[in-house]
Amino acid sequence: MLTDQDAIISDALNHASIIDGVRLCKAERHRYANGDMAELEQKLKETQGKRLRMIATDGVFSMDGYLAKLDQICELAEKYDALVMVDDSHASGFVGKTGRGTPEHFGVTAKIDVLTSTLGKALGGGSGGFIAARQEIVDLLRQKARPYLFSNTVAPPIIGGTHRVLDLLAGSTALRDAVMEN
């Protein structure tokens, strides 16, 4: 998705999977101190000459459990015309009023360009994951993303289990509320 004409700006405490993805992409790589919006803004200013800029962050930082400042990140992305990629693997299913993750919690769902998550945590599948994005991004990934091209499809029972979990979450917030109370 990103080329050597682009830049990716990653939170320093992102999950290892994001860090490895950043290392593998051809874009110019930048890091900002965890949650430091002033440094993120500086990196956005420094990379204004790039074709595309993408801010990459976890939704929930797994080691400490605190949330990325998605409202502020999205404001900066709008101001500097950057894309926002959120890995919400540690939030899908229970963060946000209806469990739709950190973008829902911060009211910025429509401002997230690429959302990734797993089916192996709160969504109950045990393996697999997904990317949600605009159709043009999904189409590009289906054609160019080597991990997608050279992997197997998720097993139908896992999809069935995840579908059931999503039905349960849509029908009631009781499970999510219990997690948040604890």
Tell where the protein language model's regions lie, with residue ranges.
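Conserved PLP-anchoring active-site segment centered on the Schiff-base-forming lysine
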Residues: 1-16, 182
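Short, small-residue-enriched loops and turns at beta-alpha junctions
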Residues: 16, 38, 59-64, 91-94, ...
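Active-site C-terminal subdomain of aminotransferase-like
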Residues: 80-83, 90, 95-182
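Active-site-proximal loop->helix
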Residues: 16-25
